[in-house]
Amino acid sequence: MNDLISSSFKRYTDLNHQVQLDDIESQNVSLDSGNLDEFFGYVESVKEDMKAVDEIHKRLQDANEESKTVHDSKAVKKLRARMDSSVTEVLKRVKMIKTKLVALEKSNAAQRKVAGCGPGSSADRTRTSVVSGLGKKLKDMMDDFQRLRTKMATEYKETVERRYFTVTGQKADEETVEKLISSGESERFLQKAIQEQGRGQVMDTLSEIQERHDTVKEIERSLLELHQVFLDMAALVEAQGNMLNDIESNVSKASSFVMRGTDQLHGAKVLQRNNRKWACIATILAIVVVIVILFPILFNTLLRP
């Protein structure tokens, strides 16, 4: 069993190292900032990787459901190998997605330095919005794997409770179960109890329990690392989203200023027209007053001999 665990962990470590090398090589590949076709091609590549991750998640769910009906240690071992393979594959896929998102972010940053494509431009808003959309999908994926990890841990806890009752005839309290799981002593305790009670015929059951324990712990470690990668990507995409929100906020403020300026200009024109109208009226009134004053004087002057 120890050989199996060591072998599985070594494969996982080797793959993790290879992924890191792949990441370094991928980061050396530049994405043409001005080429939208290449940008959207990269986006489609990320979506394909996401689709593959969804399929692996479905396989892990199916394997977890299958584990509930398997009670033979050899069958559990075979199932564990499948799940190990799926988890290492999903880790590699997700790290590839992370590398591509970094490339997209660098491409967007370079694009903002191009004349006419700076922050707030339609091209920049489109690019930022696309990356932000990928981030929302990544968050959903992260939540899916987090729920799967929680579900597996809960179901394993229930398995330990059932086995404890089978061996001792007593229902384990919360503290006992947590101690058995956290310390890894559940299998040792069950083995001791079985031997003391002379239940040699159920040793295969013990092997099955140990396989389940090893599977859950190994998968949980891998899923925790996967969760951390998701968190790293979420931080990257959140920065893009905040930038988009800032751009949209500034555009909204600019639009508000323009509208306010337009309203003020319209008001000024109306005021100007009103001033002209009143000036004309005042002029006419002044002329009328002058005529009214001068007419009698002129009339009397004309009537004098």
From Swiss-Prot:
Start and end residues of each t-SNARE coiled-coil homology domain: 206-268
Stretches that traverse the bilayer: 279-299
Entry's family note: Belongs to the syntaxin family.
Top-level taxon of the source organism: Eukaryota
Null allele phenotype: Reduced root hair length.
Membrane topology: Single-pass type IV membrane protein
Protein name: Syntaxin-123
Presence of the UniProt keyword Protein transport in the record: yes
Coiled coil: 46-66
Keywords associated with the record: Acetylation, Coiled coil, Membrane, Protein transport, Transmembrane, Transmembrane helix, Transport
GO cellular component entries: membrane
Species of origin: Arabidopsis thaliana
Gene: SYP123
